[in-house]
Design a protein with these regions (language model features):
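Bacterial Sec-dependent N-terminal signal peptides
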Residues: 1-25
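Proteolytic maturation boundary segments
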Residues: 22-51, 238-326, 330-332, 392-396, ...
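M16 family metallopeptidases and their MPP-like homologs
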Residues: 50-52, 57-74, 81-82, 99-149, ...
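Histidine-centered catalytic micro-motifs
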Residues: 79-87
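Catalytic Zn2+-binding segment of zinc metalloproteases
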Residues: 88-95, 585-586
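A common structural junction motif
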Residues: 148-155, 250-256, 377-385, 636-642, ...
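Non-catalytic, conformational "gating/processing" segments within enzyme and secreted inhibitor domains
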Residues: 153, 165, 179, 216-248, ...
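Single conserved hydrophobic/aromatic residue that forms the stacking wall/gate
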Residues: 796-807
Length: 807
C-alpha cells in the first residue's frame, strides 16, 4: 500500500510542533511575503516581473526571461522543438531582424555565448543577457526590447529554420556523450508511463530534420505566452524606470485566448522497486542510486513557513547522512568510492515528484556490497533515526550557512538573486529575503526537536515507490547483476539487522597546550595597497589588508619558496598524491572525521599544498572564527597526524576511480596533449593505478615534514574584514611561535617540465561511439615575470576555455 501523503503528514507534524512551541494559534499558514527589496508584479496580460536594484557589480545588470515551458510539453511528433525554438530566438525578431541581436550585443561590448545565451530543460526554458553595461546609453531599453521580442515576436522564417536544422543536428551529434546515452537507456525504466521517459531536451533527430516550419510556429504560439513568462532584471538599474518601461513595452504582448493548460506531468507510483541498469563504452564510473519517491509539499503550503521548515529538515537529514558516509569512507576498505544523500524536491529530472536519494560511486565488481551498505545505512536511519549529537552539529552548521548569507546580504552578485527568482517563478516556494529567512530559521532550529526530524526522514524512507538506478562502463570483463539479482540484493539488505548509530565526539581543545607567545618586532604601515606588514620574532612576515568587500570573510594565504622541484625523481609518484594525502590523517589529537565534527558550526578552513616552486597554506574564516583558523595553522606546522587506515581507504578508492578513466575519450586526448607539450617528462604525467606500487605514505609524511616543519621564509597574508588590533594577539600566539630555523630556499627551475620547442603536430585516432574531432593549439614564448604581465595573463586566461595559468 503506497503512502501518498507521507511528506505532507510529516511536514505538518513538524509545523504543528514548531507553532505550538512558539505559542501561536494553529490556523492556515499565510504565504511568506515577497522580499520588499524586490519589485514584483504581474501585468494584465499575465506577464510576471521581478526587478531588484543591486550594485554588485556597479554599472552592470542581468536581464532574464524565464519560460515555464520545456521539452516535457512536446508531443511525440514535436520532440526537440522546445530546444529548436530556443535556437531560433537568436535568429531574428520583430525589432532585431536576422543577426540583429548578436550585432547589438557585440556593439556594446558583450559577447554571444558568454553574456547572451539560453538553455532548455525538461520543464523550463530560460534566456539571459548577463553583465550588461547599463551605464551606456540605451542599454537598459535595448535589453528589455530583446526580452520583449523573445516573449512573443520571433521571426521564425522558413530560411532561418532550414539553416538551423544543420546547427541542431551537429549539436545533437557532439552532445551524444556517455552521460546522454546512459540517460536515454535509464529514463524509460525509471519513468514508465510518464513523458519523462522520452523527452530529452535535445529531442529526436528525425523530428529535427523533418518537422514543417508551421509546426514550430504553432508550438511557439501555443506555449510562448505571457502567463507562462517572467521578466527578471537584477543590477544597477533604476527600479521605477525599469518597471515603467516593462509596463509600456510589454503591453502589446497579447494575452492568450483559451490557452492550453500548463499541467505538471505526473510520475506514476510503483509498488515494487523499479530497476534501471545502463552501460556505455565511454562511461568511466559505476554509479548506484536509490530513490525513495514521495509526493511533494503542495505549492500553497510550500510558499508558507511550512516550506521553510521542510527545507531546513531536508538540509539537516542530508548533512547527517553525508557525515555518516564520510565516516565509512575513512575505513581501510570502504564499500564505495564516494557516497551522498540528498532531497532537492525533485525525482531526478521530474519536478512533479520528490525523492529522498542516496547515491554512491561503486568500485568495479563490488556493486552488491555498495548497494547493501547504502540500504543498511538507510535502514539504520529508518529504524533508529539520528542521534541528538548528530542533530546538534547539523543544526549549527545549517544556521552558520544562513548566518553567513545574512552577514553577506549586501555583497551578493546579480546571478545569485536571478537564480532565486527564476526558481521562484518556475518551481514556486518563497522569497522573503535573507533577513526574514535568517530570523525564521533561528526560530525553527531552536524549536524543532530531533524526534520530529527523525519522524520526517523515517516517513520519507518508504517500503514502496522505490527506484534503483545503476550505470557503468560497458567493458569486457566487468560483470553486472541482472535486474532480478539487483532487486534480490536490495530486498535482502533491507531485512538485515542493524544497530543504532554510535559515535564518540571529543570536546577537547584543538591546541591543548599553548607556547609562550612571540612578539611583533617590526611594524610597517602605508605599504603598497594600503597594507600593514609585521615582522615577527621568529622571522616570519605577516601582511594585513583590511577590506570591506565581504563582512563575513577573511582570506589567508601563506607561501614560501621551495616546492616540489626540490624533490628528486624517486619521489615523483609520491608527489602526484602529496596534496591529497598529507592531511587525510587529521591534526593533533583529531582524526580527519573527528576534526570535521569538532569544527561544526564554524566557517573556517585551512589546507596545505605544494606547487612546483613553493609551499602554500590557504585558509579562510569568518571574523568570529578567526582564532580557530590560527589554531589550524599552528597545528598544520607543529602537529601533523598519520592515519594508516585513512590512507588505505584513499588508496583503495583512488585506484578504483582511476581504473576505467581511459574509457573516456577526453582523458585519452588529455594524455596525448600532455605528451605533445611535455614529452615523456614524468613530472607532467597524471596519476595511474600502477603508480601506487611506488607510493609510500610514510615517505609522503616525511616530505611534508621537510617542507612544512620549518616556517622560515613564509609570508602570511590576511585580506578581508580584519581589525588589526584584534588580530595581533593571534599572530603573536600562533604565528610568532611557529618553529623557524632561518633557512630560506628556492625552487629548482631545472626540474620544472619544459614545453616542447619548435613546431609540433600530434594527430591520433580514437574509436568513439559518436565520432567527433577535438583540436588544441598551444603557443609558447618568453615573457618577463612581473606583476603587470601576471595580471594581464590572468585577465586573458579568465576568458579562455580553461583555467590554464600563465607561467
Amino acid at each position: 500500500m503506497i503512502k501518498r501523503h507521507s511528506i505532507l503528514t510529516a511536514i505538518l507534524l513538524c509545523f504543528v510542533a514548531f507553532t505550538q512551541v512558539m505559542a501561536q494559534e494553529m490556523q492556515e499558514p499565510e504565504p511568506l511575503p515577497i522580499d520588499p527589496k524586490v519589485r514584483y508584479g504581474k501585468l494584465s496580460n499575465g506577464l510576471t516581473y521581478y526587478i531588484r536594484h543591486n550594485d554588485q557589480p556597479k554599472d552592470r545588470a542581468d536581464f532574464y526571461i524565464a519560460q515555464n515551458v520545456g521539452s516535457i510539453l512536446e508531443e511525440e511528433n514535436q520532440r526537440g522543438l522546445a530546444h529548436f525554438l530556443e535556437h531560433m530566438a537568436f535568429d531574428g525578431s520583430r525589432n532585431f531582424p536576422n543577426n540583429g541581436m548578436d550585432e547589438y550585443i557585440e556593439s556594446v561590448g558583450m559577447r554571444s555565448g558568454e553574456n547572451f545565451n539560453a538553455y532548455t530543460s525538461f520543464d523550463e526554458t530560460v534566456y539571459m543577457i548577463t553583465n550588461a553595461p547599463v551605464n551606456k546609453s540605451g542599454v537598459v531599453d535595448s535589453c528589455l526590447l530583446i526580452l520583449h521580442d523573445w516573449s512573443g515576436f520571433l521571426a521564425l522564417t522558413d530560411s532561418a529554420i532550414q539553416k538551423e536544422r544543420g546547427v541542431i543536428r551537429e549539436e545533437w551529434r557532439t552532445r551524444q556523450d556517455a552521460q546522454t546515452r546512459l540517460w536515454e537507456q535509464q529514463l524509460p525504466k525509471m519513468y514508465p508511463g510518464s513523458r519523462y521517459a522520452n523527452r530529452m531536451p535535445i529531442g529526436s533527430i528525425d523530428v529535427i530534420e523533418n518537422f514543417k516550419p508551421d509546426e514550430l510556429r504553432a508550438y511557439y504560439k501555443k506555449w510562448y505566452r505571457p502567463d507562462l513568462q517572467a521578466i527578471i532584471i537584477v543590477g544597477d538599474v533604476n527600479v521605477d524606470q525599469v518597471e515603467a518601461t516593462i509596463k509600456k513595452m510589454f503591453a502589446d504582448v497579447p494575452a492568450p485566448v483559451n490557452p492550453a493548460k500548463r499541467e505538471q506531468v505526473s510520475v506514476p507510483d510503483n509498488d515494487l522497486p523499479l530497476i534501471s541498469i545502463a552501460k556505455d563504452k565511454e562511461a568511466s564510473n559505476t554509479i548506484l542510486y536509490i530513490f525513495y519517491k514521495h509526493d511533494k509539499l503542495p505549492n500553497d503550503l510550500n510558499r508558507t513557513i511550512a516550506g521553510l521548515v521542510k527545507d531546513y529538515i531536508q538540509q539537516i537529514c542530508a548533512s547527517i547522512m553525508d557525515e555518516r558516509f564520510d565516516d565509512i569512507l575513512h575505513q581501510a576498505n570502504p564499500p564505495f568510492i564516494y557516497a551522498q544523500a540528498y532531497d532537492d524536491d525533485n525525482f531526478m529530472i521530474a519536478k512533479s515528484k520528490g525523492a529522498w536519494t542516496v547515491a554512491a560511486l561503486a568500485k568495479e565488481g563490488e556493486i552488491d556490497s555498495t548497494l547493501t551498505t547504502l540500504v543498511k545505512e538507510t535502514q539504520r536511519v529508518k529504524q533508529y533515526g539520528f542521534t541528538p549529537s548528530e542533530y546538534e552539529r547539523a543544526r549549527i552548521n545549517v544556521l552558520k550557512q544562513y548566518e553567513s548569507a545574512y552577514n553577506e546580504r549586501n555583497n551578493q552578485k546579480n546571478d545569485a538573486y536571478v537564480r532565486e527568482y527564476v526558481n521562484h517563478f518556475t518551481n514556486g516556494g518563497y522569497i522573503p529575503g535573507i533577513e526574514m529567512e535568517y530570523t525564521l530559521l533561528n526560530q525553527i532550529a531552536q524549536n524543532i526537536p530531533v524526534e520530529q526530524v527523525n519522524q520526517y526522514i523515517q516517513d520519507m524512507i518508504g517500503e514502496d515507490n522505490i527506484v534503483i538506478g545503476l550505470t557503468g562502463p560497458d567493458k569486457e570483463g566487468i560483470k553486472y547483476p541482472t535486474e532480478e539479482n539487483l532487486l534480490r540484493t536490495f530486498l535482502k539488505a533491507r531485512q538485515m539487522p542493524v544497530e543504532p548509530y554510535k559515535e564518540t565526539v571529543s570536546n577537547e581543545p584543538l591546541v591543548p597546550t599553548l607556547p609562550t607567545p612571540g612578539q611583533i618586532t617590526e611594524t610597517k604601515t602605508g605599504q603598497p595597497f594600503g597594507a600593514t606588514v609585521f615582522t615577527l620574532s621568529n622571522g616570519i612576515k605577516v601582511v594585513l589588508k583590511p577590506t570591506e568587500f565581504k563582512k563575513d570573510e577573511i582570506i589567508m594565504t601563506a607561501t614560501s619558496p621551495g616546492g616540489s622541484t626540490l624533490f628528486g625523481t624517486k619521489d615523483i609518484d609520491n608527489l602526484k598524491v602529496f596534496n591529497d594525502v598529507i592531511e587525510i590523517g587529521g591534526l593533533g589529537n583529531f582524526s580527519a572525521t573527528d576534526l570535521s565534527k569538532r569544527l561544526a558550526g564554524k566557517k573556517v578552513s585551512c589546507a596545505l599544498s605544494l606547487s612546483q616552486d613553493s609551499e602554500n597554506v590557504n585558509g579562510m574564516a569568518a571574523p568570529s572564527d578567526l582564532r580557530t583558523l590560527f589554531e589550524l595553522i599552528y597545528l598544520s606546522f607543529t602537529a601533523p597526524r598519520m592515519d594508516e587506515e585513512a590512507y588505505a581507504s584513499f588508496e583503495t578508492r583512488t585506484k578504483a576511480q582511476l581504473q576505467n578513466m581511459e574509457l573516456n575519450p577526453m582523458v585519452a586526448f588529455s594524455d596525448s596533449l600532455s605528451k605533445a607539450v611535455y614529452g615523456d617528462n614524468p613530472r607532467a604525467s597524471r596519476l595511474r593505478p600502477q603508480d601506487f606500487e611506488h607510493i609510500s605514505y610514510p615517505r609522503i609524511m616525511e616530505m611534508r615534514k621537510e617542507r612544512f616543519s620549518d616556517a622560515s621564509g613564509f609570508v602570511f597574508t590576511f585580506v578581508g574584514n580584519i581589525q588589526i588590533d584584534s588580530i595581533r594577539p593571534y599572530i603573536e600566539q600562533y604565528l610568532a611561535t611557529l618553529p623557524s630555523q632561518g633557512k630560506i630556499e628556492k625552487g629548482n627551475p631545472a626540474e620544472v617540465p619544459s614545453t616542447r620547442k619548435g613546431d609540433y603536430m600530434n594527430r591520433f585516432n580514437r574509436s568513439m561511439e559518436i565520432p567527433k574531432v577535438t583540436v588544441a593549439n598551444l603557443y609558447t614564448g618568453q615573457m618577463e615575470y612581473n606583476l603587470e604581465n601576471i595580471i594581464t595573463c590572468l585577465l586573458y586566461t579568465s576568458d579562455a576555455a580553461d583555467d590554464t595559468p600563465c607561467v
